């Protein structure tokens, strides 16, 4: 794939990521009043399901799509998830590869419904890590805007 093609693909994936990040931010705001200590009734709220699903989708788009396409565009050899995250850290897109691995593990728990039994903890972790995802999305957007063809 040529560089202009990979840049176009990256920009398309980045638009999807930014759209999902916007939905995630709105869901975070809508969940602000939910108190997980009050019992499972609040956790059965559709807002919680929408929020955790959007968190998982945003993490997936960032890690599995956009960051991997950025590597492809910059002619990096495909590698493991750790390789992708370490390169993103070196570029200044993420603060820490370790943090993004935790986010990716949380995403996997949500996607494979391992989170059902621990919904309160999952919900709180999603709230905790959402600013990190939103920040990484913005930094990737900034980084991509300075890429050569």
Language-model region placement:
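Solvent-exposed interaction patches of small proteins and small membrane subunits
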Residues: 1-149
């Amino acid at each position: 794939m040529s560089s202009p093609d990979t840049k176009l693909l990256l920009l398309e994936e980045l638009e999807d990521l930014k759209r999902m990040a916007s939905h995630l931010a709105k869901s975070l705001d809508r969940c602000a009043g939910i108190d997980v200590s009050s019992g499972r009734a609040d956790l059965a709220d559709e807002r919680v399901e929408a929020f955790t699903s959007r968190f998982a989708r945003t993490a997936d788009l960032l890690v599995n799509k956009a960051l991997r396409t950025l590597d492809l565009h910059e002619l990096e050899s495909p590698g493991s998830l750790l390789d992708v995250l370490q390169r993103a850290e070196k570029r200044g897109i993420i603060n820490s590869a370790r943090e993004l691995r935790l986010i990716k593990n949380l995403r996997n728990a949500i996607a494979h419904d391992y989170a059902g039994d621990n919904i309160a903890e999952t919900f709180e972790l999603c709230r905790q890590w959402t600013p990190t995802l939103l920040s990484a999305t913005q930094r990737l957007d900034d980084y991509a805007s300075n890429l050569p063809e």
